[in-house]
């Protein structure tokens, strides 16, 4: 089966964020991209274009990001580099995707659908904490179990202290320098759709909330409008979850999968039944080096 016979997903983890660079658990905290992260996104776009040109296939026709700004900034840079105009739209379980894609707002513009189901795993009370500090507190075995095991789960977040409050926010005086955005303000569409947002997650729970989106939105849309490819910008855990579902990776083996920042991974699926065909990084050497750096996070000294 050749490249032109398959449906292609260009999947990547967002470029480096401000908290990535500080070795801090980010989770649902809305960290911005660093200049390095923006550079990674531009390089990703060039790799995608080179691949499409060399295989005589079209550039992606639709994009997907999480609701967190670091994926949206990564997508913005990629599409700007590719010369593609785009329109962002938040989707929930109440969204009729087919009707939305026929909306005139997308005429001459690539749709980019944003969903919380692509958000990073919610790291609970670990969010905003330095990884070496958590390693020291929990010890190597428990740290690696919670961080890497399919069922490992951090303690729940205290949203009264670790989320920006809508009124009378106390800032860092609560003991937390980095907080996730106020949910009522950030996730209004999800609140209206009665989506249940987590306060801590295992990778297993990320898979559960992401799988319906993959099947009912990404693959269903590809089938209905005969797409050749799409681009998905996610996070370490949401990309691992996509791989687990698409490739059928076991619960045991998924703990050994590490996702580097800003390097496109191509997943090819059979057009007839969307079964897995193959996967490969567009920059395999860099992916290998940077994936090992991800695995080693927390074992370095504090900056």
Curated annotation (Swiss-Prot):
Query: Which HAMAP family does the entry link to?
Result: PGAM_GpmA (MF_01039)
Its domain of life reads Eukaryota
SMART domains reported for this sequence: PGAM
Query: What is annotated as the active site?
Result: 14, 120
UniProt protein name: Phosphoglycerate mutase 3
Q: Where is this region: Disordered?
A: 168-198
Q: What does this protein do?
A: Could be non-functional.
Q: Which PROSITE patterns match?
A: PG_MUTASE
Q: Where is the composition biased (Basic and acidic residues)?
A: 177-198
Task: Tell me which residues are marked as the site Transition state stabilizer.
Answer: 235
